[in-house]
């Protein structure tokens, strides 16, 4: 783990509550609004920020996040600007962990070594790259770890006992458990199944296990947070941004505040959840 990530999860464990991990697309609907949203997240209760890297072919994303990526790209967002977004955020917040989430193609085009150096300079703590399996660890995972950036893996309900050790081998920071198969924005999973999955994963790792896909309300966050070390919310935040926009897709007067209000409610859910020790 990076020091920021390690410190944050240790503090949350001491408090006895799960992390609220909030995702939004960098540059949606524009750079300045996106930075305003990012700055508002910690004050509203976000413990970790997942910053989406826009990509033209996001195969694992549902319609809401696909549209967010399209809005960001249309507004001129690039990977370089996404790193700058993190750097600008770091000018006023040196404590909140930032995880970049997206696909390998933009990183490959940028240049792996240059990307990692720029990510470190921007204050990035971790990466989630959804289309790089463990068999391709030499591409980005190993170089990232060597430079001190966490590489966070996704586990799913179909990740069986035989596959799980390979998935977890070079994972650091936390494990992201995708609580159901399919694309982002799916329905809420069965909390009892999530609890069993978290326990199963923890038999193989001491890393925190954060659960995402389908969490949209404070009650959802409370239910999932009862057994997970963290609750990941993405589509609900992206939808909140989308509904706040003007008819021509520009930021509304209340876009930042609308996101902050939603996150404040989600934080109430995670803060009322009681962590169950996964043994």
Swiss-Prot record:
Catalytic activity: (1S,2R)-1-C-(indol-3-yl)glycerol 3-phosphate + L-serine = D-glyceraldehyde 3-phosphate + L-tryptophan + H2O
SUPFAM superfamilies: Ribulose-phoshate binding barrel (SSF51366)
UniProt keyword list: Amino-acid biosynthesis, Aromatic amino acid biosynthesis, Lyase, Tryptophan biosynthesis
One Pfam family named in its UniProt record: Trp_syntA
UniProt-listed Enzyme Commission number(s): 4.2.1.20
Keyword Lyase recorded: yes
UniProt-annotated catalytic positions: 50 (proton acceptor), 61 (proton acceptor)
Broad class of enzyme this protein falls into: lyase
Gene3D superfamilies (alphabetical): Aldolase class I
Highest taxon in the source lineage: Bacteria
Keyword Amino-acid biosynthesis part of the UniProt annotation: yes
InterPro entries per UniProt: Aldolase_TIM, RibuloseP-bd_barrel, Trp_synthase_alpha_AS, Trp_synthase_suA
GO cellular component: cytosol
Pathway the protein takes part in: Amino-acid biosynthesis; L-tryptophan biosynthesis; L-tryptophan from chorismate: step 5/5
GO molecular function: tryptophan synthase activity
Family: Belongs to the TrpA family.
Quaternary structure (record): Tetramer of two alpha and two beta chains.
Function: The alpha subunit is responsible for the aldol cleavage of indoleglycerol phosphate to indole and glyceraldehyde 3-phosphate.
PANTHER family: TRYPTOPHAN SYNTHASE ALPHA CHAIN, CHLOROPLASTIC, TRYPTOPHAN SYNTHASE, ALPHA CHAIN
Entry-linked HAMAP family: Trp_synth_alpha (MF_00131)
UniProt-recorded name of the protein: Tryptophan synthase alpha chain
Organism of origin: Rhizobium rhizogenes (strain K84 / ATCC BAA-868)
């Amino acid at each position: 783990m990076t020091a920021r990530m390690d410190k944050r999860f240790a503090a949350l464990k001491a408090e006895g509550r799960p992390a609220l991990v909030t995702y939004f697309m960098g540059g949606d609907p524009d750079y300045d609004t996106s930075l305003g949203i990012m700055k508002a997240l910690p004050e509203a209760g976000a413990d970790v920020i997942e910053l989406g890297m826009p990509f033209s072919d996001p195969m694992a994303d549902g319609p809401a996040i696909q549209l967010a990526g399209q809005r960001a790209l249309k507004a001129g967002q690039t990977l370089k600007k996404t790193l700058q977004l993190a750097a600008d955020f770091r000018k006023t917040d040196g404590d909140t962990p930032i995880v970049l989430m997206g696909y390998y193609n933009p990183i490959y085009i940028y240049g792996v070594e240059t990307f990692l150096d720029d990510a470190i300079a921007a204050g990035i703590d971790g990466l989630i790259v959804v289309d790089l399996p463990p068999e391709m660890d030499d591409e980005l995972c190993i170089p990232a770890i060597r430079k001190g950036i966490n590489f966070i893996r996704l586990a799913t309900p179909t990740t069986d006992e035989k596959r799980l050790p390979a998935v977890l081998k070079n994972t650091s920071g936390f494990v992201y458990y995708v609580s159901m198969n399919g694309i982002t924005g799916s329905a809420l999973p069965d909390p009892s199944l999530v609890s069993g999955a978290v326990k199963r994963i923890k038999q193989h790792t001491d890393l925190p296990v954060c659960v995402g896909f389908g969490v949209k309300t404070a009650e959802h966050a409370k239910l999932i947070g009862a057994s997970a070390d963290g609750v990941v919310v993405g589509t609900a935040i992206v939808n909140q941004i989308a509904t706040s926009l003007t008819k021509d897709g520009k930021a509304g007067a209340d876009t930042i505040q609308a996101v902050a209000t939603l996150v404040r409610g989600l934080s109430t859910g995670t803060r009322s959840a009681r962590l169950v020790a996964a043994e």
